[in-house]
Each structure stands twice: as C-alpha cells, then as structure tokens.
C-alpha cells in the first residue's frame, strides 16, 4: 500500500509516470505482467503505445484518479455510501477474470467477494498477470464467450 499513499500527493505521481518518456509506467506494467508476455513482440508494441499515451496532457492525472478516489473517498460521505452499496449481493450475472500470476489483485480477496456475486463466474487466466486481456486475449475471449452463452442461453458468434 505505500504506492497507494504516494499517489495521494499532488503533481509528483504524474511527473513520475511521464518522466523519461514513461519509463515508470513501463516499470509498473513489467512488475504486474507475466514474463511470457514481456518476451513477446506484442509487449514491445503495447508498452511503446502506453508510454506514448501517458504523455498526453492529463492522461497521467486521469490514470491516477481511481487510486486517489479509492483512498480519499473512505473519509467522505460518497465513499461510505459506496461501501454500503457494495455490501449488498448483486443480482446480475458477473464474470470476474484474474490472471493467475497477478501480483496486484490477489486470489484470496477475489475469492472472498463471491458472496457478493452469487450468480458470478470466476475464472483464472493461466500464465497471465494483471493485464490478462493483453497477455492472453484468446483465453479471455473464450471466457467471455462462455459467459455470454451462459447468460443468454444460446451460442454467441
């Protein structure tokens, strides 16, 4: 959690993400993704695009807002209302995908959320880290297809 606290400081985190053409962004992605994806050509292309995108004015600020809101909102009324609403089980079907090598979203907390999504489908993406949709798009698409076929009770093409 120290990184979450560092993101609360104004301006510095944005500068950190954009400095040296987005080198910090690349470091974060590498720390949260699988070695197999990093070794591929797709990773080099993707990381190049991400490093360019983080340089767009306000992109770094927007990328950090989720972490800022998650920390700060706990002290405000909106955060308390959000947390109350999240304690109720959801009645809609949910697909929760997680890379089995994700060091950021851990398996145990994910498994504890099952009580809130009784109609949920939880799937682990083998060999993927935090960016499963980028690292293993075929597996993710297969899971999405199966989920949609289950929800709509018919084949999805």
Enumerate the predicted regions with their spans.
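C-terminal amphipathic helix plus adjacent low-complexity
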Residues: 154-157
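Flexible "cap/lid" subdomain of the alpha/beta-hydrolase fold that forms the substrate-access gate
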Residues: 1-124, 145, 150-152
């Amino acid at each position: 959690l120290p990184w979450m606290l560092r993101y609360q400081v104004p301006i510095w985190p944005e500068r950190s993400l954009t400095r040296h053409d987005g080198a910090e962004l690349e470091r974060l992605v590498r720390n949260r993704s699988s070695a197999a994806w990093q070794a591929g050509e797709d990773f080099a292309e993707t990381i190049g695009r991400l490093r360019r995108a983080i340089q767009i004015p306000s992109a770094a600020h927007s990328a950090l807002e989720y972490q800022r809101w998650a920390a700060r909102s706990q002290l405000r009324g909106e955060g308390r209302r959000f947390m109350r609403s999240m304690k109720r089980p959801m009645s809609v079907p949910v697909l929760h995908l997680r890379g089995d090598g994700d060091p950021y979203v851990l398996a145990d907390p994910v498994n504890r959320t099952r009580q809130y999504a009784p109609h949920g489908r939880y799937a682990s993406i083998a060999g993927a880290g935090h960016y499963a949709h980028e690292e293993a798009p075929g597996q993710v698409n297969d899971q999405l297809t199966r989920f949609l076929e289950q929800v709509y009770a018919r084949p999805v093409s």
